[in-house]
Amino acid sequence: MNNFFNPSRPSPRPWPNRKKQTDKSAIFLCSVSILVVFFIVVFFITYSEMPKSLFSISAFSGSVQFPQCRSEILTRTLLGQKFLWYAPHSGFSNQLSEFKNALLMAGILNRTLIIPPILDHHAVALGSCPKFRVLSPSEIRISVWNHSIELLKTDRYVSMADIVDISSLVSSSAVRVIDFRYFASLQCGVDLETLCTDDLAEQSQAYESLKQCGYLLSGVRGNVDKCLYAVDEDCRTTVWTYKNGEADGRLDSFQPDEKLKKKKKLSNVRRRRDVYKTLGHGTEAESAAILAFGSLFTAPYKGSELYIDIHKSPKIKSLVEKVDFLPFVREIMIAGKKFASETIKAPFLCAQLRLLDGQFKNHRESTFTGLYQKLEALSVKNPGLINVFVMTDLPEFNWTGTYLGDLSKNSTNFKLHFIGEQDEFLARTEHELDSASHGQKFGSIPMSLDSIKKMQTHCYPHGGSNVQLYIEEAVCSCASLGFVGTPGSTIADSVEMMRKYNACSSS
Protein backbone atom coordinates (compact mmCIF):
# COMPACT_ATOMS: atom_id res chain seq x y z
CA MET A 1 0.00 0.00 0.00
CA ASN A 2 2.85 2.38 0.85
CA ASN A 3 4.40 1.72 -2.52
CA PHE A 4 1.12 2.64 -4.32
CA PHE A 5 0.69 6.02 -2.60
CA ASN A 6 4.35 6.90 -2.58
CA PRO A 7 5.66 6.86 -6.13
CA SER A 8 9.07 8.20 -5.03
CA ARG A 9 9.92 4.86 -3.45
CA PRO A 10 10.91 2.12 -5.91
CA SER A 11 8.70 -0.92 -6.00
CA PRO A 12 10.40 -4.27 -6.37
CA ARG A 13 7.27 -5.86 -7.93
CA PRO A 14 5.29 -3.18 -9.79
CA TRP A 15 3.44 -5.35 -12.33
CA PRO A 16 1.77 -7.82 -9.97
CA ASN A 17 0.55 -5.04 -7.73
CA ARG A 18 -0.77 -2.98 -10.72
CA LYS A 19 -2.63 -5.99 -12.06
CA LYS A 20 -4.47 -6.50 -8.82
CA GLN A 21 -5.80 -2.94 -8.94
CA THR A 22 -6.81 -3.01 -12.61
CA ASP A 23 -8.20 -6.51 -13.09
CA LYS A 24 -11.81 -5.42 -12.62
CA SER A 25 -11.46 -2.34 -14.84
CA ALA A 26 -9.78 -4.32 -17.60
CA ILE A 27 -12.46 -6.99 -17.51
CA PHE A 28 -15.18 -4.33 -17.64
CA LEU A 29 -13.57 -2.47 -20.57
CA CYS A 30 -12.98 -5.71 -22.44
CA SER A 31 -16.60 -6.75 -21.98
CA VAL A 32 -17.87 -3.39 -23.21
CA SER A 33 -15.59 -3.55 -26.27
CA ILE A 34 -16.78 -7.02 -27.15
CA LEU A 35 -20.41 -5.92 -26.85
CA VAL A 36 -19.81 -2.86 -29.06
CA VAL A 37 -18.10 -4.96 -31.75
CA PHE A 38 -20.90 -7.52 -31.54
CA PHE A 39 -23.62 -4.90 -32.05
CA ILE A 40 -21.73 -3.32 -34.97
CA VAL A 41 -21.39 -6.70 -36.69
CA VAL A 42 -25.05 -7.52 -36.09
CA PHE A 43 -26.10 -4.11 -37.45
CA PHE A 44 -24.17 -4.47 -40.71
CA ILE A 45 -25.33 -8.04 -41.25
CA THR A 46 -28.92 -6.96 -40.65
CA TYR A 47 -28.52 -3.86 -42.85
CA SER A 48 -27.18 -5.88 -45.77
CA GLU A 49 -30.08 -8.31 -45.57
CA MET A 50 -32.82 -5.70 -45.22
CA PRO A 51 -34.78 -4.72 -48.32
CA LYS A 52 -33.25 -1.65 -49.92
CA SER A 53 -36.61 0.07 -49.86
CA LEU A 54 -36.27 0.48 -46.11
CA PHE A 55 -33.40 2.87 -46.68
CA SER A 56 -34.68 4.48 -49.86
CA ILE A 57 -36.82 7.54 -50.30
CA SER A 58 -39.85 5.32 -50.85
CA ALA A 59 -39.79 4.40 -47.17
CA PHE A 60 -40.37 8.04 -46.21
CA SER A 61 -42.74 10.81 -47.11
CA GLY A 62 -41.76 12.21 -50.51
CA SER A 63 -43.06 15.66 -49.61
CA VAL A 64 -40.72 15.75 -46.60
CA GLN A 65 -37.61 14.52 -48.39
CA PHE A 66 -38.38 16.31 -51.67
CA PRO A 67 -40.44 19.52 -51.60
CA GLN A 68 -40.83 19.02 -55.37
CA CYS A 69 -43.21 16.17 -54.58
CA ARG A 70 -45.69 18.18 -52.53
CA SER A 71 -49.25 17.54 -53.65
CA GLU A 72 -49.87 21.18 -54.60
CA ILE A 73 -46.95 21.04 -57.07
CA LEU A 74 -48.09 17.77 -58.60
CA THR A 75 -51.78 18.68 -58.83
CA ARG A 76 -51.76 22.46 -59.34
CA THR A 77 -48.42 23.51 -60.80
CA LEU A 78 -48.10 20.41 -63.01
CA LEU A 79 -51.90 20.16 -63.47
CA GLY A 80 -51.93 16.53 -62.43
CA GLN A 81 -50.28 15.47 -65.68
CA LYS A 82 -48.12 12.36 -65.97
CA PHE A 83 -44.65 12.82 -67.46
CA LEU A 84 -41.97 10.68 -69.04
CA TRP A 85 -38.29 11.54 -68.68
CA TYR A 86 -35.33 9.62 -70.13
CA ALA A 87 -31.55 9.89 -70.46
CA PRO A 88 -30.15 10.19 -74.02
CA HIS A 89 -26.48 9.60 -74.74
CA SER A 90 -23.66 9.69 -77.29
CA GLY A 91 -23.77 11.76 -80.51
CA PHE A 92 -26.69 13.53 -82.14
CA SER A 93 -27.84 10.64 -84.34
CA ASN A 94 -28.07 8.31 -81.34
CA GLN A 95 -29.88 11.00 -79.37
CA LEU A 96 -32.36 11.42 -82.22
CA SER A 97 -33.09 7.68 -82.35
CA GLU A 98 -33.69 7.69 -78.58
CA PHE A 99 -35.96 10.71 -78.95
CA LYS A 100 -38.10 8.77 -81.43
CA ASN A 101 -38.30 5.82 -79.02
CA ALA A 102 -39.24 8.20 -76.21
CA LEU A 103 -42.09 9.61 -78.31
CA LEU A 104 -43.39 6.07 -78.85
CA MET A 105 -43.12 5.20 -75.16
CA ALA A 106 -44.89 8.41 -74.17
CA GLY A 107 -47.69 7.66 -76.63
CA ILE A 108 -48.12 4.09 -75.41
CA LEU A 109 -48.11 5.06 -71.72
CA ASN A 110 -50.19 8.23 -72.24
CA ARG A 111 -47.57 10.49 -70.69
CA THR A 112 -46.22 13.93 -71.54
CA LEU A 113 -42.68 13.67 -72.90
CA ILE A 114 -40.08 15.99 -71.39
CA ILE A 115 -38.05 17.15 -74.41
CA PRO A 116 -34.33 17.02 -73.58
CA PRO A 117 -31.52 19.28 -74.75
CA ILE A 118 -29.03 18.15 -77.37
CA LEU A 119 -26.07 16.88 -75.37
CA ASP A 120 -22.46 17.51 -76.29
CA HIS A 121 -21.02 14.74 -78.44
CA HIS A 122 -20.17 11.81 -76.14
CA ALA A 123 -20.68 13.91 -72.99
CA VAL A 124 -22.68 10.94 -71.72
CA ALA A 125 -21.71 7.40 -72.69
CA LEU A 126 -23.95 4.38 -72.15
CA GLY A 127 -21.43 1.60 -72.72
CA SER A 128 -21.97 -1.63 -74.65
CA CYS A 129 -25.21 -3.58 -74.50
CA PRO A 130 -23.84 -6.60 -76.43
CA LYS A 131 -21.00 -6.84 -73.90
CA PHE A 132 -23.39 -6.28 -70.97
CA ARG A 133 -21.20 -3.38 -69.86
CA VAL A 134 -23.39 -0.29 -69.42
CA LEU A 135 -24.07 2.44 -66.89
CA SER A 136 -27.01 1.71 -64.64
CA PRO A 137 -30.20 3.69 -65.39
CA SER A 138 -29.75 5.84 -62.27
CA GLU A 139 -26.13 6.61 -63.18
CA ILE A 140 -26.95 7.70 -66.71
CA ARG A 141 -29.95 9.73 -65.50
CA ILE A 142 -27.84 11.74 -63.05
CA SER A 143 -25.16 12.22 -65.73
CA VAL A 144 -27.72 13.61 -68.18
CA TRP A 145 -29.27 15.84 -65.52
CA ASN A 146 -25.88 17.27 -64.54
CA HIS A 147 -24.90 17.85 -68.17
CA SER A 148 -28.23 19.53 -68.91
CA ILE A 149 -27.68 21.96 -66.03
CA GLU A 150 -24.12 22.54 -67.25
CA LEU A 151 -25.46 23.46 -70.70
CA LEU A 152 -27.75 26.01 -69.05
CA LYS A 153 -24.96 27.42 -66.89
CA THR A 154 -22.60 27.81 -69.85
CA ASP A 155 -25.20 29.33 -72.17
CA ARG A 156 -25.10 26.41 -74.65
CA TYR A 157 -28.57 24.93 -74.24
CA VAL A 158 -30.34 23.85 -77.44
CA SER A 159 -33.55 21.80 -77.31
CA MET A 160 -34.05 18.78 -79.54
CA ALA A 161 -37.21 20.55 -80.75
CA ASP A 162 -35.11 23.55 -81.85
CA ILE A 163 -33.47 21.30 -84.46
CA VAL A 164 -36.02 18.56 -85.24
CA ASP A 165 -39.49 19.46 -86.50
CA ILE A 166 -42.17 17.87 -84.30
CA SER A 167 -44.93 20.35 -85.15
CA SER A 168 -47.06 17.82 -87.05
CA LEU A 169 -46.83 15.30 -84.20
CA VAL A 170 -47.95 17.83 -81.62
CA SER A 171 -50.67 19.44 -83.74
CA SER A 172 -52.19 16.02 -84.46
CA SER A 173 -52.27 15.27 -80.71
CA ALA A 174 -50.25 12.12 -81.35
CA VAL A 175 -48.09 13.01 -78.34
CA ARG A 176 -47.92 15.61 -75.59
CA VAL A 177 -44.62 17.33 -74.87
CA ILE A 178 -43.06 19.90 -72.56
CA ASP A 179 -39.71 21.67 -72.75
CA PHE A 180 -37.18 20.47 -70.16
CA ARG A 181 -36.45 24.04 -69.06
CA TYR A 182 -40.09 24.87 -68.38
CA PHE A 183 -40.65 21.54 -66.64
CA ALA A 184 -37.56 22.03 -64.45
CA SER A 185 -38.72 25.53 -63.58
CA LEU A 186 -42.14 24.26 -62.48
CA GLN A 187 -41.01 21.07 -60.76
CA CYS A 188 -37.93 22.47 -59.05
CA GLY A 189 -39.32 25.89 -58.19
CA VAL A 190 -36.62 27.82 -60.06
CA ASP A 191 -37.47 31.01 -61.93
CA LEU A 192 -36.93 30.78 -65.70
CA GLU A 193 -34.83 33.93 -65.72
CA THR A 194 -32.44 32.35 -63.22
CA LEU A 195 -32.53 28.94 -64.88
CA CYS A 196 -31.62 30.20 -68.34
CA THR A 197 -28.78 32.57 -67.48
CA ASP A 198 -25.19 32.09 -66.44
CA ASP A 199 -26.06 33.53 -63.02
CA LEU A 200 -26.79 30.00 -61.83
CA ALA A 201 -24.04 30.04 -59.18
CA GLU A 202 -23.21 26.78 -57.43
CA GLN A 203 -23.85 28.25 -53.99
CA SER A 204 -27.22 29.74 -54.87
CA GLN A 205 -30.57 28.51 -53.62
CA ALA A 206 -31.67 27.88 -57.21
CA TYR A 207 -28.66 25.64 -57.82
CA GLU A 208 -29.37 23.67 -54.64
CA SER A 209 -32.99 23.24 -55.71
CA LEU A 210 -31.86 21.90 -59.09
CA LYS A 211 -29.36 19.61 -57.40
CA GLN A 212 -32.11 18.19 -55.20
CA CYS A 213 -34.32 17.80 -58.27
CA GLY A 214 -31.52 15.84 -59.92
CA TYR A 215 -31.37 13.44 -57.00
CA LEU A 216 -35.12 13.00 -57.24
CA LEU A 217 -35.42 12.44 -61.00
CA SER A 218 -32.35 10.24 -61.26
CA GLY A 219 -33.86 7.80 -58.80
CA VAL A 220 -30.57 7.38 -56.93
CA ARG A 221 -32.51 7.62 -53.67
CA GLY A 222 -35.33 5.35 -54.77
CA ASN A 223 -38.91 5.82 -55.87
CA VAL A 224 -41.21 8.40 -54.29
CA ASP A 225 -44.85 7.49 -53.84
CA LYS A 226 -47.12 9.23 -56.40
CA CYS A 227 -44.20 11.38 -57.53
CA LEU A 228 -41.43 9.33 -59.18
CA TYR A 229 -41.10 5.82 -60.55
CA ALA A 230 -37.57 5.11 -61.74
CA VAL A 231 -37.26 2.30 -64.30
CA ASP A 232 -34.22 0.22 -63.37
CA GLU A 233 -34.57 -2.36 -66.15
CA ASP A 234 -32.00 -1.86 -68.90
CA CYS A 235 -30.65 -3.72 -71.93
CA ARG A 236 -28.91 -6.28 -69.71
CA THR A 237 -32.19 -7.61 -68.38
CA THR A 238 -35.06 -6.44 -70.55
CA VAL A 239 -36.39 -6.07 -74.09
CA TRP A 240 -39.53 -3.93 -74.09
CA THR A 241 -42.40 -5.11 -76.30
CA TYR A 242 -45.98 -3.93 -76.80
CA LYS A 243 -49.04 -6.09 -77.45
CA ASN A 244 -47.33 -8.34 -79.95
CA GLY A 245 -49.17 -11.49 -78.91
CA GLU A 246 -46.22 -13.24 -77.29
CA ALA A 247 -46.06 -14.42 -73.69
CA ASP A 248 -45.02 -11.62 -71.37
CA GLY A 249 -41.75 -12.33 -69.58
CA ARG A 250 -40.41 -15.03 -71.89
CA LEU A 251 -36.68 -15.28 -72.52
CA ASP A 252 -35.23 -13.22 -75.34
CA SER A 253 -33.30 -15.01 -78.07
CA PHE A 254 -30.13 -13.04 -77.30
CA GLN A 255 -28.48 -13.99 -74.03
CA PRO A 256 -24.91 -13.65 -72.74
CA ASP A 257 -22.90 -16.71 -73.71
CA GLU A 258 -21.19 -18.89 -71.11
CA LYS A 259 -17.77 -17.37 -71.83
CA LEU A 260 -19.09 -13.85 -71.20
CA LYS A 261 -20.97 -14.96 -68.10
CA LYS A 262 -17.80 -16.44 -66.66
CA LYS A 263 -15.56 -13.54 -67.67
CA LYS A 264 -17.89 -10.80 -66.40
CA LYS A 265 -19.44 -12.89 -63.61
CA LEU A 266 -22.88 -12.22 -65.06
CA SER A 267 -26.14 -13.58 -63.77
CA ASN A 268 -28.27 -11.48 -66.13
CA VAL A 269 -31.12 -13.07 -68.05
CA ARG A 270 -32.82 -10.99 -70.74
CA ARG A 271 -36.60 -11.22 -70.76
CA ARG A 272 -39.15 -9.76 -73.17
CA ARG A 273 -41.65 -7.68 -71.20
CA ASP A 274 -44.72 -5.78 -72.33
CA VAL A 275 -44.11 -2.11 -71.48
CA TYR A 276 -47.80 -1.36 -70.95
CA LYS A 277 -48.39 -4.34 -68.65
CA THR A 278 -45.30 -3.41 -66.65
CA LEU A 279 -45.54 0.39 -66.52
CA GLY A 280 -49.02 1.27 -67.77
CA HIS A 281 -52.58 1.23 -66.44
CA GLY A 282 -53.05 -0.63 -63.17
CA THR A 283 -49.36 -0.83 -62.30
CA GLU A 284 -47.38 0.77 -59.48
CA ALA A 285 -45.70 3.03 -62.02
CA GLU A 286 -49.01 4.48 -63.24
CA SER A 287 -49.62 6.46 -60.05
CA ALA A 288 -46.28 8.28 -60.27
CA ALA A 289 -46.32 11.78 -61.76
CA ILE A 290 -42.92 11.16 -63.37
CA LEU A 291 -41.78 7.95 -65.01
CA ALA A 292 -38.00 8.02 -65.47
CA PHE A 293 -36.23 5.72 -67.93
CA GLY A 294 -32.51 5.44 -68.43
CA SER A 295 -31.26 5.19 -71.99
CA LEU A 296 -33.83 4.36 -74.68
CA PHE A 297 -31.26 3.34 -77.27
CA THR A 298 -31.88 0.17 -79.23
CA ALA A 299 -30.59 -1.52 -82.36
CA PRO A 300 -31.05 -4.89 -84.08
CA TYR A 301 -28.62 -7.48 -82.74
CA LYS A 302 -28.33 -11.21 -83.41
CA GLY A 303 -31.94 -11.66 -84.45
CA SER A 304 -33.38 -9.52 -81.67
CA GLU A 305 -33.32 -5.94 -80.41
CA LEU A 306 -30.95 -4.64 -77.77
CA TYR A 307 -33.65 -2.96 -75.67
CA ILE A 308 -36.87 -1.93 -77.46
CA ASP A 309 -38.88 -4.09 -79.86
CA ILE A 310 -42.14 -2.21 -80.34
CA HIS A 311 -41.77 -0.75 -83.83
CA LYS A 312 -43.67 -3.55 -85.57
CA SER A 313 -46.59 -3.61 -83.16
CA PRO A 314 -49.87 -3.25 -85.12
CA LYS A 315 -51.45 -1.43 -82.16
CA ILE A 316 -49.27 1.65 -82.69
CA LYS A 317 -48.71 1.43 -86.44
CA SER A 318 -49.97 4.97 -87.05
CA LEU A 319 -47.74 6.49 -84.36
CA VAL A 320 -44.71 4.52 -85.55
CA GLU A 321 -45.22 5.85 -89.07
CA LYS A 322 -45.44 9.43 -87.81
CA VAL A 323 -42.30 9.08 -85.68
CA ASP A 324 -40.27 7.10 -88.22
CA PHE A 325 -38.96 10.23 -89.92
CA LEU A 326 -38.61 13.55 -88.12
CA PRO A 327 -37.24 16.20 -90.50
CA PHE A 328 -34.96 19.04 -89.56
CA VAL A 329 -36.63 22.41 -89.01
CA ARG A 330 -37.01 24.60 -92.10
CA GLU A 331 -34.02 26.87 -91.33
CA ILE A 332 -31.64 23.91 -91.59
CA MET A 333 -33.21 22.46 -94.72
CA ILE A 334 -33.20 25.85 -96.45
CA ALA A 335 -29.50 26.29 -95.64
CA GLY A 336 -28.67 22.82 -97.01
CA LYS A 337 -30.62 23.32 -100.22
CA LYS A 338 -29.09 26.77 -100.69
CA PHE A 339 -25.56 25.37 -100.38
CA ALA A 340 -26.37 22.69 -102.96
CA SER A 341 -27.89 25.13 -105.46
CA GLU A 342 -25.65 28.16 -104.98
CA THR A 343 -22.27 26.66 -104.06
CA ILE A 344 -22.13 23.25 -105.76
CA LYS A 345 -24.39 24.36 -108.65
CA ALA A 346 -24.41 20.93 -110.31
CA PRO A 347 -25.52 17.32 -109.79
CA PHE A 348 -23.31 15.80 -107.10
CA LEU A 349 -22.48 12.72 -105.07
CA CYS A 350 -22.44 12.90 -101.27
CA ALA A 351 -19.73 10.99 -99.39
CA GLN A 352 -20.13 10.64 -95.63
CA LEU A 353 -16.77 9.42 -94.32
CA ARG A 354 -16.40 8.78 -90.60
CA LEU A 355 -12.69 8.15 -90.12
CA LEU A 356 -11.57 9.25 -86.66
CA ASP A 357 -14.11 8.26 -84.05
CA GLY A 358 -14.27 4.93 -82.21
CA GLN A 359 -14.23 1.77 -84.29
CA PHE A 360 -14.31 3.69 -87.58
CA LYS A 361 -10.67 4.78 -87.43
CA ASN A 362 -9.67 1.12 -87.79
CA HIS A 363 -11.65 0.68 -91.00
CA ARG A 364 -10.44 3.58 -93.13
CA GLU A 365 -9.46 1.45 -96.10
CA SER A 366 -12.83 -0.27 -96.38
CA THR A 367 -14.58 3.11 -96.04
CA PHE A 368 -12.48 4.57 -98.86
CA THR A 369 -13.02 1.43 -100.95
CA GLY A 370 -16.78 2.03 -100.99
CA LEU A 371 -16.27 5.59 -102.25
CA TYR A 372 -13.73 4.46 -104.86
CA GLN A 373 -16.12 1.85 -106.27
CA LYS A 374 -19.00 4.34 -106.44
CA LEU A 375 -16.87 6.94 -108.24
CA GLU A 376 -15.58 4.34 -110.71
CA ALA A 377 -19.16 3.37 -111.56
CA LEU A 378 -20.17 7.02 -111.97
CA SER A 379 -17.16 7.70 -114.21
CA VAL A 380 -18.35 5.02 -116.61
CA LYS A 381 -21.92 6.36 -116.70
CA ASN A 382 -21.07 10.06 -116.62
CA PRO A 383 -17.73 10.85 -118.27
CA GLY A 384 -16.43 14.26 -117.28
CA LEU A 385 -16.14 16.22 -114.06
CA ILE A 386 -17.88 14.67 -111.05
CA ASN A 387 -18.85 16.93 -108.15
CA VAL A 388 -18.49 15.34 -104.72
CA PHE A 389 -19.76 16.82 -101.45
CA VAL A 390 -17.68 15.48 -98.56
CA MET A 391 -18.83 15.35 -94.95
CA THR A 392 -16.08 13.90 -92.77
CA ASP A 393 -14.52 14.21 -89.34
CA LEU A 394 -11.04 14.14 -90.91
CA PRO A 395 -9.73 17.75 -91.13
CA GLU A 396 -8.64 18.89 -94.59
CA PHE A 397 -5.03 19.37 -93.49
CA ASN A 398 -4.90 15.61 -92.75
CA TRP A 399 -6.12 14.52 -96.18
CA THR A 400 -2.57 14.20 -97.53
CA GLY A 401 -1.67 10.56 -98.08
CA THR A 402 -5.30 9.41 -98.08
CA TYR A 403 -7.76 8.70 -100.89
CA LEU A 404 -9.36 12.07 -100.16
CA GLY A 405 -6.02 13.74 -100.78
CA ASP A 406 -5.70 11.93 -104.11
CA LEU A 407 -9.20 13.03 -105.16
CA SER A 408 -8.54 16.66 -104.25
CA LYS A 409 -5.45 16.66 -106.48
CA ASN A 410 -7.33 15.12 -109.42
CA SER A 411 -9.10 18.35 -110.38
CA THR A 412 -9.58 17.12 -113.96
CA ASN A 413 -12.06 14.42 -112.99
CA PHE A 414 -13.33 15.46 -109.55
CA LYS A 415 -14.33 18.62 -107.74
CA LEU A 416 -14.68 18.32 -103.97
CA HIS A 417 -16.99 20.52 -101.90
CA PHE A 418 -17.23 20.74 -98.13
CA ILE A 419 -18.44 23.10 -95.42
CA GLY A 420 -15.74 24.79 -93.37
CA GLU A 421 -16.20 25.49 -89.68
CA GLN A 422 -15.78 29.22 -90.28
CA ASP A 423 -18.19 29.52 -93.20
CA GLU A 424 -20.33 32.62 -92.78
CA PHE A 425 -23.61 30.92 -93.56
CA LEU A 426 -23.18 28.65 -90.51
CA ALA A 427 -23.30 31.65 -88.20
CA ARG A 428 -26.23 33.04 -90.17
CA THR A 429 -28.18 29.79 -89.81
CA GLU A 430 -27.42 29.66 -86.08
CA HIS A 431 -28.80 33.17 -85.71
CA GLU A 432 -31.96 32.18 -87.58
CA LEU A 433 -32.42 29.16 -85.31
CA ASP A 434 -31.92 31.38 -82.26
CA SER A 435 -34.62 33.73 -83.50
CA ALA A 436 -37.05 30.93 -84.36
CA SER A 437 -36.74 29.19 -80.95
CA HIS A 438 -38.91 26.31 -82.14
CA GLY A 439 -38.51 24.41 -78.88
CA GLN A 440 -40.47 27.05 -76.97
CA LYS A 441 -43.57 26.65 -79.12
CA PHE A 442 -44.69 23.35 -77.64
CA GLY A 443 -46.00 22.65 -74.16
CA SER A 444 -48.83 20.69 -72.59
CA ILE A 445 -48.92 23.12 -69.66
CA PRO A 446 -49.96 26.65 -70.68
CA MET A 447 -47.43 29.38 -69.90
CA SER A 448 -48.31 32.65 -68.23
CA LEU A 449 -47.49 35.82 -70.15
CA ASP A 450 -44.62 36.42 -67.75
CA SER A 451 -43.20 32.92 -68.37
CA ILE A 452 -43.52 33.36 -72.14
CA LYS A 453 -41.61 36.64 -71.94
CA LYS A 454 -38.87 35.08 -69.81
CA MET A 455 -38.54 32.08 -72.13
CA GLN A 456 -38.26 34.35 -75.15
CA THR A 457 -35.81 36.71 -73.46
CA HIS A 458 -33.56 34.33 -71.56
CA CYS A 459 -34.10 30.79 -72.89
CA TYR A 460 -33.54 31.12 -76.63
CA PRO A 461 -30.97 28.73 -78.25
CA HIS A 462 -27.39 29.94 -78.10
CA GLY A 463 -25.74 28.20 -81.04
CA GLY A 464 -24.19 25.51 -78.88
CA SER A 465 -25.44 22.73 -81.11
CA ASN A 466 -23.55 21.34 -84.09
CA VAL A 467 -25.35 23.20 -86.86
CA GLN A 468 -22.68 22.17 -89.37
CA LEU A 469 -23.59 18.49 -89.01
CA TYR A 470 -27.30 19.14 -89.55
CA ILE A 471 -26.71 21.25 -92.65
CA GLU A 472 -24.31 18.65 -94.07
CA GLU A 473 -27.00 16.00 -93.71
CA ALA A 474 -29.47 18.33 -95.43
CA VAL A 475 -27.01 18.83 -98.31
CA CYS A 476 -26.58 15.06 -98.65
CA SER A 477 -30.33 14.59 -98.86
CA CYS A 478 -30.17 16.65 -102.08
CA ALA A 479 -27.36 14.65 -103.74
CA SER A 480 -28.80 13.61 -107.12
CA LEU A 481 -25.85 11.35 -108.04
CA GLY A 482 -26.27 9.24 -104.94
CA PHE A 483 -24.92 8.76 -101.46
CA VAL A 484 -22.00 6.77 -100.03
CA GLY A 485 -22.08 6.36 -96.26
CA THR A 486 -19.80 4.79 -93.69
CA PRO A 487 -21.04 1.29 -92.78
CA GLY A 488 -22.29 1.18 -89.20
CA SER A 489 -22.53 4.96 -88.85
CA THR A 490 -25.78 6.32 -87.42
CA ILE A 491 -25.13 9.53 -89.37
CA ALA A 492 -25.26 7.49 -92.59
CA ASP A 493 -28.53 5.93 -91.41
CA SER A 494 -29.96 9.40 -90.79
CA VAL A 495 -29.04 10.59 -94.30
CA GLU A 496 -30.51 7.43 -95.84
CA MET A 497 -33.75 8.11 -93.96
CA MET A 498 -33.86 11.68 -95.27
CA ARG A 499 -33.32 10.47 -98.82
CA LYS A 500 -35.97 7.77 -98.42
CA TYR A 501 -38.55 10.40 -97.45
CA ASN A 502 -37.40 12.91 -100.12
CA ALA A 503 -36.62 15.51 -97.48
CA CYS A 504 -34.88 17.78 -99.97
CA SER A 505 -37.85 18.16 -102.30
CA SER A 506 -40.56 18.14 -99.64
CA SER A 507 -39.09 20.83 -97.40
UniProtKB/Swiss-Prot annotation:
It is a single-pass type II membrane protein. Its main location: membrane. The chain crosses the membrane at residues 26-46. Glycans are attached at residues 110, 146, 398, 410. One of its GO terms (biological process) is fucose metabolic process. GO terms for cellular component: endosome; Golgi apparatus; Golgi medial cisterna; membrane; trans-Golgi network. Its EC number is 2.4.1.-. It is found in: Membrane. Pathway: Glycan metabolism. Keywords: Carbohydrate metabolism, Fucose metabolism, Glycoprotein, Glycosyltransferase, Membrane, Signal-anchor, Transferase, Transmembrane, Transmembrane helix. GO terms for molecular function: glycosyltransferase activity. Gene3D superfamilies: 3.40.50.11340, 3.40.50.11350. The keyword Cell inner membrane does not apply. PANTHER family: O-FUCOSYLTRANSFERASE 30 (PTHR36050:SF1). Belongs to the glycosyltransferase GT106 family. This is O-fucosyltransferase 30. It comes from Arabidopsis thaliana. The lineage of its organism: Eukaryota, Viridiplantae, Streptophyta, Embryophyta, Tracheophyta. The gene is OFUT30.
